[in-house]
């Protein structure tokens, strides 16, 4: 029976309501930068690799603004469920985690939301809450208030050339697109534009990962958005993705990076400076009945285990958060202890971490440089605007092309301090040599596309 204390706590959760926007399942129309946040159209349940699993209690929706790119992942449950949270790292961004730490033995969580956009993306969590109200699942009555919890990751900075963020429109698109038994691993949802390995200068593409396991009647699902300061490693200690420095081994191991810190292990293995705002946000779901204390320990145990798959983990530059949910559909099996359940769940979470790693953009290799006419070179020259903060000036000189950033900050390998020579790579496509990919595609008239592909950034010629 619900206590008076828990009833009063529910009353304190009432929020102001907003209008639900019209949604579209069709691809977003082509917009020209600089993009207006108001004009962006959500694209739902796309990207990544599909993972199917059998658990009717869970519905998952994902939405993105491809122009960012940035996105949201919404996990909603068939009824209110019991939740717990474990917050680590030096810079978390959360909604309603304090309430979960009150340990009320009452199932109250409707949804867990993960979002890009740093603290601006916290709007996604409250947007899901109002969507619960707007669709009639929840109401304004004191014992039927919706409760969405969630966290954000930092996906701004040098990984993209704009500051588009997930908003109410995007989050509610993900909410209404939620479907049973489907999760997308890799560059999708809140993991649409994540990175790993800034700690070592790896700057690798990352994403979101999911995994599922059933042991008898017990179901365990793990979901994580990996935007870690550290690197992702498999069970043998092999680093899964890294743009290595000169002289680094091809099969890079965690021990190669972690030993002898802070000094580099080998000559030339310096650790470059970089942004120190990273976060891994995760969710472990079990169908076993648990009380609040047991669920809290599950969150702590699984969260602690993640330091095996991400190294280093929970640093001052991370804002790591772990949610744990019990759907309470089955009793505890005979012989299954809480530490055993935590051990199994920890392995499922490691699988989810590994599933988050997408195929990496390859570094361009010039084998036979194409001939570029003087006419084409002059046509490519001009001022290109990616956003209000990033522009690039392309100039022609002596039959060659050069580029220099003219906005507030650099554009990948193109800096504000000096012109970079653009090396012909393919017809209409050029590159800037360096540790990380910097590819410039001029094949679309009046536009410049940098690093073409799923993380591409587009500018228009002024």
Per-range role (PLM):
Residues 22-24:
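Boundary at the C-terminal end of the N-terminal hydrophobic targeting segment
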Residues 11-19:
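Bacterial N-terminal signal peptides
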Residues 5-6, 225-229, 286-289, 387-389, ...:
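Histidine- and/or cysteine-centered catalytic micro-motif in compact active-site loops
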Residues 124-129:
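Short Gly/Thr/Asp-enriched flexible loops that form oxyanion-binding sites at enzyme active sites
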Residues 26-119, 123, 134-365:
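A structural signal for small-residue-enriched, beta-sheet-centric alpha/beta enzyme cores
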Residues 2-11:
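Bacterial N-terminal signal peptides that target proteins for export
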Residues 7, 16, 44, 66, ...:
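A generic structural signal for short, solvent-exposed coil/turn residues
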Residues 366-462:
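Peripheral terminal and inter-domain segments
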